[in-house]
Amino acid sequence: MLHYKFHQSTKNSNDLIVLLHGFISDQSTFDEHIKTFTDEINVLTIDLPGHGFDQSSETSTWNFEFICQLLDDTLALFKAYRIFLHGYSMGGRIALYYALYGTCHLNGLILESSSPGIADEDDRIERIQIDQARAKVLEIAGLEIFVNDWEKLPLFQSQYNLNTETKRKIRQMRLQQNPVRLAKALRDYGTGQMPNLWPKISDIAIPTCIIVGSFDEKFIKIGYHMCDLIPETSLFEVKGSGHTVHVEEITEFDKIVLGFIFKEEQND
C-alpha cells in the first residue's frame, strides 16, 4: 500500500480527487490546494515509491505493474467514493497506466503535463541512459548537486518567476528526499521504463481532462495528440504557466479541476 493522507471535505461530498506528484517531490506539493478542494470535495494525497514517507521495499522492483498494484490496494479503501485520479508529470504517467490496467473504478482522469510514454524505441533507450546517468549523479555527487542541476533544466525555467518563498519551499521539499531511493525510482519507473501506451490510450473509456502550460511547447504537442486519441477528452492550456501548472497557476488549476469534476457529477 502507498503512503497517503486523506483530507475530508467540509461538505457532505462523495467526490474524491487522488493527487499523484512528480519526480523529486512528494504529496506536500499539493498543500496549497487542500483548502480550496476540501471546501467542495475530498482529497487523497499520495507519496509515490522512493518519495516522501513512502516505505516501499528497495528489494522490490518499482515498475509500473508494481505501482499499479499498490495503487489498487490503496484506492480499494475508498471505493465508496467517486474517484477522480490526477497525476502530474511522473504521476501522470502512473495515472495513465492505472486508467488502463488498474482495477478500481475511476470516474475521471486528470493529466497534468503528462505523456503516455516514448513511441520510438531508439528514443526510449536514449532516455533510459539519461535516467541511469541521473541516478548515478544522485548516488555519487549527492542530492544538493543533483537539485542544483535539476532546477536549471529548461522544463522548469518558468519557475524562476515564482516568488522567493515559493521557490524556497520547492527547493526544501526536493532536498528532503532520499537520494538513494530517488535513484532507484529513476531506474525502475523513469520515463524510459514506461511502456509505450500510445497505441492503448484510445481504450481509455472515462472522461479525461488534460492540463498543460502555455510555455510548455513539448507537452502542449503531446497533450493535443492525446486529445485526438482518447475518446472523451478536454484540454486546457493555462496561460502564463510552464510545466508545473499546479505550482505556477494555483487558482486556475483549482478552477479547471473542480469544474471538470462538477461537470462529470452532473453528467452521471
PLM segments and residue spans:
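Conserved HGGG/HGGXW glycine-rich cap/lid loop of the alpha/beta-hydrolase fold
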Residues: 5-56
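Active-site loop/oxyanion-hole signature of alpha/beta-hydrolase fold enzymes
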Residues: 44-86, 255
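Gly/Ala-rich beta-loop-alpha elbow adjacent to hydrolase catalytic centers
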Residues: 87-91, 95
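Flexible "cap/lid" loop of the alpha/beta hydrolase fold
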Residues: 100, 107-139
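Conserved alpha/beta-hydrolase catalytic His-Asp/Glu region
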Residues: 122-125, 137-200
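Short beta-strand/loop motif that positions the catalytic acidic residue
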Residues: 204, 210-212
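Conserved alpha/beta-hydrolase "acid-adjacent" motif
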Residues: 217-222
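Catalytic histidine-centered segment of alpha/beta-hydrolase-like enzymes
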Residues: 241-250, 254
